[in-house]
Design a protein with these regions (language model features):
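Conserved metal-binding segment of the jelly-roll/cupin
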Residues: 155-173
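Phosphate-handling active-site elements
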Residues: 150-153
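Catalytic-core "active-site belt" of small-molecule-metabolizing enzymes
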Residues: 1-134, 143, 148
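Short, structured beta-strand/loop micro-motifs enriched in basic residues and often containing a Trp
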Residues: 139-146, 159-163
Length: 173
């Protein structure tokens, strides 16, 4: 099921011209996940309407999360994942694009296609609908869950939210 954890300044990397060299030092069993990120310009409301969620986003960017697992052979429960900060290791964010510059973005996101390559060989592919039917609905889910959990602070303007992997997580070296 869906889970979330914190991304820290020290684990957030902005790719320059969509390129980044990232150290895997200190990460345990790292894997790569292609994702979509949003930067919030204001606090999104509790809604399942993708257009309303998008109105509160400043920009969108493709991203790569490097996840890690402290459990042998990635064998764990959901509770283990949550205790391991949702497996977060690094978040590499590509070039941000202002959401208003992409016509029909909310409707197009479920159909967004991504291919994951390793040494010029495609090892996986996915679509935006793989994350709760749309990256925007994934963001809406997070808003809803945080609102229902009074001990969790709500999302804030300026925060960057990654919406979940579009493919399986694959080992990276």
């Amino acid at each position: 099921g869906p889970m979330w954890g914190a991304v820290y300044d020290r684990t957030l990397i902005f790719a320059q011209n969509n390129h980044a060299v990232v150290s895997l030092a200190g990460l345990v069993q790292p894997r790569i996940e292609p994702e979509i990120c949003f930067k919030l310009k204001s606090v999104p409301p509790r809604t399942r309407n993708p257009l309303e969620i998008l109105e509160h986003s400043e920009w969108i960017a493709h991203s790569v999360e490097i996840v890690q697992c402290h459990h042998p052979e990635w064998k764990m429960t959901l509770a283990d994942c949550v205790a391991d900060n949702a497996l977060h290791g690094r978040l590499i964010v590509g070039t941000p694009v202002a959401v208003e510059k992409i016509a029909g973005l909310a409707a197009a996101l479920p159909f967004l296609k991504i291919s994951l390559f390793k040494n010029q060989v495609r090892i996986d592919h996915g679509v935006g609908a793989n994350v709760l039917d749309s990256p925007l609905l994934s963001l809406a889910f997070l808003v809803e869950i945080l609102a229902a959990q009074k001990e969790s602070p709500p999302l804030q303007a300026g925060e960057i939210v990654s919406t979940g992997t579009l493919t399986d997580a694959h080992p990276v070296q």
